[in-house]
Amino acid sequence: MDTNNTNNINSLENPIDLENDPNILFTELNVKLESLITFLTKNDKDNQIFVDEIIDNKVTDLLIASKELENYFISQQSKYSAEKNKIQLKQEIYKVKKEIENKDRLIERYKNKVKEWKYHFEPLYQSQNHILHSTAQGLSGIENQFSPVFTPMPNTPSILQNLSQAKPSPSLGLGSTIL
């Protein structure tokens, strides 16, 4: 019984490094299971008095070892989740970076097109502008044939006023009106 207590104290004093090796946890769990099975199958008369107490200790040891293993798996799962989130974030950043690069290339391409169009159409525009201004100066004494013809706007309030006046309706009788 003293060796069991010493083993329990040693296992509690030497915490298992969960970061390094899960095999240690599996080995410890396996040893404790073997110890429990050996104890249960052993038929020693001297130990029959303490059977309940020893079984409780063995089961407690087994539960502690399984809890340590469970904690290890939980820590691994949280690490995996954190790594997964980092990878997803990196993928999203990469995707946005590619979109920006594509848009920058598109902007550069259209910027070059605008320059090309400007070099092509600017001389035409300047020559047409020069012709237009020289023609307008030559025709300053004559009525400008390029000026727009003035079209009077209808008097909108008087039209609305005429439409809103009451008029007799032949179908409704002499005194009726339609607005």
Curated annotation (Swiss-Prot):
Keywords, in A-Z order: Activator, Coiled coil, Nucleus, Transcription, Transcription regulation
Top-level lineage group: Eukaryota
Single GO MF annotation: transcription coregulator activity
Database matches in Pfam families: Med28 (PF11594)
Main location: nucleus
Keyword ATP-binding in record: no
Single Gene Ontology BP annotation: transcription by RNA polymerase II
Subcellular localization(s) per the UniProt record: Nucleus
Coiled coil region boundaries: 81-119
GO cellular component: mediator complex
Signal peptide (UniProt feature, chain positions): none
Function: Component of the Mediator complex, a coactivator involved in the regulated transcription of nearly all RNA polymerase II-dependent genes. Mediator functions as a bridge to convey information from gene-specific regulatory proteins to the basal RNA polymerase II transcription machinery. Mediator is recruited to promoters by direct interactions with regulatory proteins and serves as a scaffold for the assembly of a functional preinitiation complex with RNA polymerase II and the general transcription factors.
Similarity comment: family membership: Belongs to the Mediator complex subunit 28 family.
Subunit annotation: Component of the Mediator complex.
Protein name (database record): Putative mediator of RNA polymerase II transcription subunit 28
Organism whose genome encodes this protein: Dictyostelium discoideum
